[in-house]
């Protein structure tokens, strides 16, 4: 990637002095652009440890195959990043990278029945479930009934700025300004299209909004026997380490409280 495409007319011819169809800007030529560095459990783990918690990590595949058991843990931190269902070629092969598989849904739901609280963060946590011509009923039921969230729209922000708001959840007092990365750079991947989400029932409430338009960026929910928190952008893209630590501690304090 060297820059955004500016010539989209197929009829535009190419010459040495004039770029034709497919020509793009060169403002990123030679620049190092961060992608998936596969070390985000460590980024989340830093904030978990700063809040006084220990942690272990596992792959989704290990959970789906039953190798890693989720029962017995107090908190599940699901790192969704920018994962979403992606078509392969012209559709001759099955799509890949869907966020929620049936096996993962069952594993997380079983864990919540033993009291596990769940934190889910990612740019497509809602749109990958709801934004389909025929949404999968199992996925929708999991999002709404187990996690307590629903889709409020895509392309929720272009500034990368959110803020927490005062709610009935005393552990998250509000008035914290948060910046997540929305620009290509060499340190952490760019979030171009975060989700807006809202609580699916009266057990939950929004606690975070996108600064530019006040759309919901995150919800918390008191479920039956456990609690959840969902963000419409990836936690690991929050620019400030101090803010990541603060937000993680507030969410964990909410999980641990009885009110």
Predicted segments — roles?
Residues 61-67, 102-106, 213-218:
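Alpha-helical scaffolding within the catalytic cores
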């Amino acid at each position: 990637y060297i820059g955004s495409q500016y010539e989209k007319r197929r009829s535009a011819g190419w010459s040495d002095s004039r770029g034709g169809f497919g020509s793009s800007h060169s403002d990123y030529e030679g620049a190092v652009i961060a992608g998936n560095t596969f070390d985000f459990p460590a980024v989340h783990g830093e904030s978990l440890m700063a809040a006084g918690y220990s942690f272990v990590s596992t792959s989704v595949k290990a959970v789906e195959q039953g190798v890693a058991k989720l029962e017995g843990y107090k908190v599940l931190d699901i790192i969704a990043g920018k994962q979403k269902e992606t078509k392969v070629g012209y559709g001759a092969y099955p799509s890949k990278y869907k966020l929620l598989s049936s096996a993962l849904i069952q594993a997380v739901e079983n864990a919540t029945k033993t009291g596990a609280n769940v934190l889910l963060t990612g740019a497509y946590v809602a749109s990958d479930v709801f934004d389909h011509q025929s949404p999968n009923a199992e996925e929708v039921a999991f999002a709404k009934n187990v996690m307590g969230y629903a889709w409020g729209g895509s392309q929720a922000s272009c500034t990368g700025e959110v803020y927490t708001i005062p709610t009935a959840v005393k552990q998250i007092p509000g008035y914290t300004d948060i910046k997540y990365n929305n620009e290509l750079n060499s340190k952490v991947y760019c979030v171009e299209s975060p989700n807006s989400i809202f609580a699916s029932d009266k057990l939950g409430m929004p606690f975070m909004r996108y600064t530019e338009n006040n759309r919901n960026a995150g919800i918390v929910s008191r479920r039956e026997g456990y609690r959840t928190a969902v963000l419409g952008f990836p936690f690991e893209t929050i620019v400030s380490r101090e803010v990541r630590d603060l937000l993680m501690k507030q969410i964990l304090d909410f999980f641990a409280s009885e009110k």
